[in-house]
């Protein structure tokens, strides 16, 4: 197993699919990385040489991925909550942020129903 950005990449998968296992890299970005490093998208990770894996590591290092990206997202949410803006308040109350109705739906975001006390 190759290790890129602190993640063990599965050997038996194609390069594009294997790169999407890294948080912050989707199909489009994985294809762009393969294009810049001139590695075939359908080549399996186990078929790549160590030099090609090193070029993949360098290409992935140019992007914000994994722990840094998770930290950045959580800091953005925390900033919204500290500002007290509408989106921050919705985050704090665990409600939908983007204008969805909450009278009947939004069970995933709100969690299980709480019984009404009498």
Curated annotation (Swiss-Prot):
Keyword terms of this UniProt record: Ribonucleoprotein, Ribosomal protein, RNA-binding, rRNA-binding, tRNA-binding
This protein's record includes keyword Flavoprotein: no
Pfam family, one: Ribosomal_S13
Gene3D superfamilies: 1.10.8.50, 30s ribosomal protein s13, domain 2
Segments of this protein annotated with the region Disordered: 94-118
Gene Ontology CC terms: cytosol; small ribosomal subunit
Keyword Ribosomal protein: yes
GO biological process: translation
Superkingdom in the source lineage: Bacteria
Example of a GO MF term: tRNA binding
InterPro entries according to UniProt: Rbsml_uS13_C, Ribosomal_uS13, Ribosomal_uS13-like_H2TH, Ribosomal_uS13_bac-type, Ribosomal_uS13_CS
Function in brief: Located at the top of the head of the 30S subunit, it contacts several helices of the 16S rRNA. In the 70S ribosome it contacts the 23S rRNA (bridge B1a) and protein L5 of the 50S subunit (bridge B1b), connecting the 2 subunits; these bridges are implicated in subunit movement. Contacts the tRNAs in the A and P-sites.
Subunit text: Part of the 30S ribosomal subunit. Forms a loose heterodimer with protein S19. Forms two bridges to the 50S subunit in the 70S ribosome.
Family as reported in the entry's similarity comment: Belongs to the universal ribosomal protein uS13 family.
Protein name: Small ribosomal subunit protein uS13
